[in-house]
A protein has these predicted regions:
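Conserved N-terminal Rossmann-fold NAD(P)-binding element of oxidoreductases
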Residues: 5-9
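SDR active-site strand-loop-helix element
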Residues: 31, 66, 103-109, 168-170
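N-terminal Rossmann-fold NAD(P) dinucleotide-binding loop
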Residues: 14-15
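Mid/C-terminal beta-alpha module of Rossmann-like enzyme folds, strongest
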Residues: 189-232, 236-239
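Substrate-positioning beta->alpha
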Residues: 145-150, 167, 176-198
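NAD(P)H-binding glycine-rich loop region in Rossmannoid oxidoreductase-like domains
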Residues: 37, 41-87
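Active-site Tyr-X1-5-Lys
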Residues: 129-165
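Conserved Rossmann-fold NAD(P)-dependent oxidoreductase catalytic core, especially the SDR/UDP-sugar
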Residues: 89-141
Length: 242
């Protein structure tokens, strides 16, 4: 029997993932605002609206959530990460008959802020900023707004999905040529998601994984530098970077 996969935010990475998943093993459902080429089981939904999507299937092996800022400003990040994830959780809660084993949420190594501030390697345990609570709701001045929103988004997802949650922090995505010192090809991003779909690790708590290529020399327009975000955790789990 095929396993059902729901992708919320079906775009470029999702289409790459769809292309490499075994068609005999998985049935893909994709949610986006507009119909996508090659996607048979399409569900139209604007995740910023209060309307609920109409989903006929109610049993999924994995749900993949791929957020995207609506623009590069504060409001765009708040809508793309915070509002969209809140509305997604609300619709899953409203649809109490929807079952899923894993919730894979895509995040960003932007959670570390400007990595040029850090001299050493950053890993998932790095104490980059204080955890935000009701008593400590806002970061200090040294934390950029994008970092704050991404960290807030991750914390919200942990609270919502608990041990079903896998957070994948993708570094600077590229298609043909890296443009940032910490980078990840879009095809590799799809392979990483596939890896977590195909393997059941039965984590007892939410898990975060940095998804970035090995820290090889990156040559930019003005200077050369090495990536400083560690990918050791995901490699120890068994993922192999090409």
């Amino acid at each position: 029997m095929k396993k059902n996969i729901l992708i919320i935010g079906y775009g470029n990475i999702a289409s790459r993932l769809h292309a490499i998943l075994c068609k005999d093993s998985y049935k893909i459902y994709g949610i986006s605002r507009s119909k996508k080429r090659g996607l048979k089981n399409f569900i139209k939904w604007d995740w910023l609206s209060k309307d609920l999507p109409n989903i006929q299937c109610n049993n999924f092996d994995s749900i993949i959530f791929i957020p995207k800022p609506t623009n590069s400003h504060q409001a765009g990040y708040q809508e793309g990460f915070l509002k969209s994830s809140e509305n997604t959780f609300n619709f899953l809660e409203a649809s109490k008959k929807i079952f899923y084993k894993k919730f894979i949420t895509i995040s960003s190594t932007g959670a570390y802020g400007l990595t040029t501030r850090h001299e050493s390697y950053l890993d998932e345990s790095s104490n980059i900023v204080p955890m935000f609570t009701e008593e400590n709701p806002y970061p200090g001045d040294e934390v950029d707004l994008g970092q704050y929103i991404i960290r807030k988004y991750e914390q919200n997802q942990m609270r919502r999905y608990r041990n079903k949650l896998i957070i994948l922090r993708l570094s600077g995505l590229y298609t043909s040529k890296p443009i940032s010192k910490n980078h990840l090809h879009r095809a590799t991003a799809a392979k990483i998601i596939k890896f977590f779909i195909e393997n059941d690790f039965d984590f007892s708590s939410p898990e975060i994984f940095n998804c970035t290529e090995d820290a090889s020399l990156f040559v930019g327009e003005k200077k050369s530098s090495y990536g400083n975000i560690s990918n050791e955790k995901i490699k120890k789990l068994g993922f192999i970077f090409d």
